[in-house]
């Protein structure tokens, strides 16, 4: 399991950003396939959720996130902030899913408060 922290916020509570690497991404492209298109087409006639596409997109998002974590590790980042998703269709049978964010190096915030006394 990866130690890369991934959040969709600009900061991580209890952590301080010490280095910004920049934008990174994880991409996957999935094909619906002829069989999936036929089943989905039949289901769309009846209305409701098309479970085959829901599973495909969920799996694709997980793959994109895994690739985003791997990209962070490869450049020495231990966190990714502002994580977002984007998707687009490529032709009529493929879908691209992108997970992207800002790769950073974070460290724990330590409160080094030194007490000063009057002598």
UniProtKB/Swiss-Prot annotation:
Q: Which cysteines are joined by disulfide bonds?
A: none
Task: Spell out the InterPro entries in the cross-references.
Answer: UPF0145_dom_sf, UPF0145_YbjQ-like
Question: Would you say which domain of life the source belongs to?
Answer: Archaea
Q: Which Gene3D superfamilies match?
A: Hypothetical protein apc22750. Chain B
Q: Per its UniProt record, what HAMAP family does this chain match? A: UPF0145
Sequence similarity? Belongs to the UPF0145 family.
Under what name is this protein listed? UPF0145 protein Ta0182
């Amino acid at each position: 399991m990866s130690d890369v922290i991934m959040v969709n916020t600009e900061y991580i509570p209890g952590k301080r950003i010490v280095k910004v690497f920049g934008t990174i991404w994880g991409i996957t492209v999935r094909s619906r396939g002829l069989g999936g298109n036929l089943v989905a087409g039949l289901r769309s006639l009846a209305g409701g959720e098309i479970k085959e596409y829901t599973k495909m997109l969920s799996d694709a998002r997980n793959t994109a996130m895994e690739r985003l974590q791997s990209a962070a590790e490869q450049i020495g980042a231990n966190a990714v902030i502002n994580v977002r998703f984007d998707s687009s269709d490529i032709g009529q049978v493929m879908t691209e899913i992108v997970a992207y964010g800002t790769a950073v190096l974070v460290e724990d915030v330590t409160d080094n408060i030194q007490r000063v006394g009057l002598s």
